[in-house]
Amino acid sequence: MPYCTSLRQHNPKIYDLFESIPVSSHEHELFARYIKNNTEIEGHLFTPKAEIEGFEDIDGLIRKYNSRLYYKHIGRRIEEYKNYLYIKSYVEDSTEIIKKLQELASSGVSQYTASVDSWISRESYTIDDDGKKEALRQMFADSHVALIYGSAGTGKSTLIKHISNFWADKDKIFLANTHPAVDNMRRKVTAGNSEYNTIAKFLSKRNNNTDCDVLFIDECSTVSNDDMRRVLEKANFKLLVLVGDVYQIESIYFGNWFSIAQKFVPETSIFELTHPYRTTNDNLLTVWDRVRKLDDAILEPLVKNSYVARLDESIFEHGEDDEIILCLNYDGLYGINNINRFLQNSNPNESVVWGINTYKVGDPILFNESNIFSPLIHNNSKGKIVSIRPEKQQIRFDIELEESINGIDAWGYDFELIGESETGKSIISFSVNKYRSTDEDDEDNDSTVIPFQVAYAVSIHKAQGLEYDSVKIVITNETEERITHNIFYTAITRAKNKLKIYWSPETEQSVLGRLEVKNSTKDAHLLSRLSSITMTS
């Protein structure tokens, strides 16, 4: 069924399928694709049968599709409940996750609050605000699971650190979907007895380290239902800490569990952080708040504070040291590739060509996933090129880091700590070979791979977890339909001080007019009835 299934890691575009395979006799596949897209892209677990347009004999299409499924793919069946259609495995995953969370929330840890108070007093431990302190005191008093919700910059990672310090002598596992999120926790958390992994690595067959006292999962909105269910089935833990923001970029695959979970567990398991620390700029905070809540007056503070501008060549002016341009597309005049190329050409320093890439002193960079300096210098760490010395067989870079490290930190890594910049940031030096040695068997430590990318501009998705003093966002008419509420909110909350959104008046109207917060209430009610699980709100 080529119109609704594909080989692993091979997902052809729909228009390529149309050009290759006649549509006749494949209507049941197109219908299944519609239901799948309405779930995975639009985020609706249940699709109202009455609202489906463009298909005839829906019941017949469902029967034909279900009858042609491979027997090991029974979870892909389309089923019906009270005139709503759903995919069997997605409902089953949601149900099992919610039931496990309800089980964990049914009882707390004996004498928990008293033990936290005693620890804070005994260690003279300082917590940066009363909200986090109270959350830590109550977190496991009545529950074995804590769901921590917070918008960008409210200190979710800091609260993870406080929880970890309290449980310092217990075994802890920290999981997240992306390497930057894992590395961020590794940097923030200094408590011992800690293991860090991506969810993919944790779920791999080779990983047997699944037992712990406390399991932490960060950026939960990016974790799919399928992955979350498998984590809960594989991990053996006593306490569970789930952290995220339902308004940030969601899972690539279907993942609604974190948004609906708060409707099924008691309030004693839910903690929300509201005070922002990323910026003290009241104008920015107003914009963030209005976009988050989809206030009718979103445009007013954007215009009043000159946060919007016509899309023109002024986007190519690089005005700040700590500045990034965020885009959705890589190609085109206002795509990431062209903006990076143009701004690098505007850099007056000498070009150094190495392989297919060009580098200049002064180029801003981001360390990437081939970064051999992790975890000290994590994936997506910012930096700046301060020296380039090409030779016949290798090239040497001096990079100013975004922060300061010391000689003990740097011990054991394949770089030299050579000094510090005028602003007190560390400068490291390392070389990259032109050719691989015949002794190199490890693909992960290829000495010819440059561990960073030039980053005048990056994608909005890659920028999640980063922050810059100045942020410019480019939205063209080609990408406006892909700007969801979550993507727009993620983009604007990367800024600490200055924000500028470049778009045409037509694109501005289109984007702001289409923004909507995904409402999971209806899905939660239907799931509750279908699976006989009790809602709490």
Per-range role (PLM):
Residues 138, 146-304:
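ASCE P-loop NTPase helicase motor core
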Residues 139-141, 167-169, 208-211, 235, ...:
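Flexible, charged surface loops at secondary-structure boundaries
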Residues 100-107, 166, 188-191, 234, ...:
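Conserved, well-folded catalytic cores of nucleic-acid-processing
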Residues 124-142:
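Pre-Walker A adenine-sensing motif
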Residues 154, 193-196, 279-282, 320-537:
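Core RecA-like ATPase module of SF1/SF2 helicases and allied nucleic-acid translocases
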Residues 148-187, 243, 299-341, 351-358, ...:
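Conserved RecA-like ASCE P-loop NTPase motor core of nucleic-acid helicases/translocases
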Residues 110-124:
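Conserved adenine-nucleotide phosphate-binding loops and their immediately adjacent elements
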Residues 1-111:
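N-terminal accessory nucleic-acid engagement/regulatory domains that precede
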